Swiss-Prot record:
Keywords for this protein: Cell membrane, Membrane, Protein transport, Translocation, Transmembrane, Transmembrane helix, Transport
Protein purpose: Part of the accessory SecA2/SecY2 system specifically required for export of possible cell wall proteins. The central subunit of a protein translocation channel.
GO biological process: intracellular protein transmembrane transport; protein targeting
GO CC annotation, single: plasma membrane
Species in which this protein is naturally found: Streptococcus agalactiae serotype III (strain NEM316)
UniProt key word Transmembrane helix: yes
Ranges that cross the membrane: 16-36, 61-81, 104-124, 132-152, 161-181, 190-210, 242-262, 286-306, 341-361, 374-394
Name of the protein described by the UniProt record: Accessory Sec system protein translocase subunit SecY2
Location of the protein in the cell: Cell membrane
Source domain of life: Bacteria
Cystine pairs: none
Membrane topology: Multi-pass membrane protein
Length: 409
């Protein structure tokens, strides 16, 4: 009874235990095999980028299982829905309608990705349409289960979907440790050391920019003492965080799923395979597109996380203002310039730090997996701060009690 009382009263302990339990379920599901599939003969194991993408999105294509799709379908859905609902179009749509749209789009995307992966399987007693559809259905179901687990964690635990992705990436990087030692023994000592040093520098810069902020002076009408001179609006230097990396991999991988399906339908058409170079990190075209997408998404996520329109409207309603800028459109324009400035800065810095190792490893299949390590750990660093910030909010909230609760005591 005492343990139950502690569990009910200690919100931090309760959230940690719930999150830990959901992580265990998530990790176990990654290794639940799909019936009828020859795991040892899975062709996708040779696709380094597909394996990397599955790791980034919480999946596992190195050893195919029920959760192999990860949260990839949900992330692709969020990107598409955001592209088609830019501005205030979705503001008047009910939550139920938005959820329905998201589920429908996610179902279509999950089927496309599931079919592309299931086609790469080898099956017991040969291939059949029934086995293909069954494997696809299981993969799609696994994607929805992961989405459900992430939503449960967001409501009852902490870290939401982000902590599942971080755990998946950490597990994937631990699996790469034997490969790093093997490359070190095969004569790649200098390359491995340079990659590790570059990754450490990138993580240090990521932490520095993550905790740096630009302070915009704000005149708050509700403050009438000496604190009015100290009021400011903090703008993070790296407002996009580590999310841009994850969405870049999503945008690069989804066309590859389409190409896999088209290649299975038109196996004699050589032009289909040639398009794959534009979305693969093993080609110069793919790396350049990767760096461009990193820049674009960094700017986009800066606007999403700061939202100059919403901030300017809130300031106008409260009577607050930025010195030398009129409330409304002028304030919004000023904040938009700040977003462009820092979004472009963080985009260039992340594209450079994440892209240089990929360029260095071009043409070398052995170093390709290790070269992506910098981007992965930058992503882990950025997402870890998001989780820590949420934990800090919960901890601070726990220090305050309800007024009515104090009166009862």
């Amino acid at each position: 009874m005492k343990l139950l009382y502690i569990f009910e009263k200690n919100i931090i302990l309760r959230k940690i235990l719930i999150t830990f339990s959901l992580i265990i379920i998530f990790l176990l599901g990654r290794y639940v095999p799909i019936p009828g599939v020859l795991i040892s003969a899975y062709k996708g194991q040779d696709n380094n980028f597909a394996t990397l993408y599955s790791t980034v999105t919480g999946g596992n294509l190195s050893q195919v299982g029920v959760f192999s799709l990860g949260i990839g379908p949900m992330m692709t859905t969020m990107i598409l829905l955001r592209l088609f609902t830019i501005g205030k179009y979705s503001s008047g749509v009910s939550q139920k309608v938005q959820q329905f749209r998201q589920n429908v789009v996610m179902l279509v995307i999950a089927i496309i990705q599931g079919l592309a992966i299931a086609i790469s399987f080898q099956y017991h007693n040969g291939f059949s349409l029934t086995k293909l559809l069954l494997a696809t259905m299981i993969l799609v179901t696994g994607a929805y289960i992961i989405s459900w687990i992430g939503n449960l964690n967001a409501e009852y635990g902490f870290g939401g979907m982000t902590i599942l992705v971080v755990v998946g990436m950490l597990v994937g990087q631990f699996n790469n440790i034997p490969l790093i030692f093997e490359l070190f023994q095969d004569g790649y000592q200098l390359a491995i050391i340079l990659f590790l040093l570059w990754t450490l520098v990138a993580m240090y810069l990521m932490i520095t920019f993550e905790r740096s902020e630009y302070r915009i002076p704000v005149m708050r009408t509700s403050i009438h003492n000496r604190l009015v001179d100290d009021a400011y609006m903090p703008i993070k230097v790296n407002a996009s965080g580590g999310m841009a990396f994850m969405y870049v991999y999503t945008l690069l991988m989804f066309p590859q799923y389409i190409i896999i399906l088209l290649r299975s339908i038109f196996p004699t058409n050589p032009d289909i395979t040639s398009y794959n170079d534009y979305f693969s990190l093993s080609s110069i075209q793919g790396v350049v597109i990767y760096m461009i997408l990193m820049l674009v998404l960094s700017v986009a996520f800066t606007f999403v996380n700061i939202d100059p329109t919403k901030i300017s409207e809130a300031m106008r309603e409260s009577g607050d203002f930025i010195p030398n800028y009129r409330p409304g459109k002028e304030t919004q324009s000023y904040l938009s310039k700040i977003c462009y400035l820092f979004g472009t800065f963080s985009g260039f810095f992340m594209a450079f730090l994440g892209g240089v190792p990929l360029l260095f490893a071009l043409g070398n299949d052995d170093l390709r997996t290790v070269s992506s390590m910098t981007g992965i750990f930058m992503m882990i660093t950025g997402m870890s701060f998001m989780i820590l910030d949420e934990f800090q909010v919960i901890r601070i909230r726990k220090q305050y009690t309800s007024v009515f609760e104090n009166e009862e005591n």
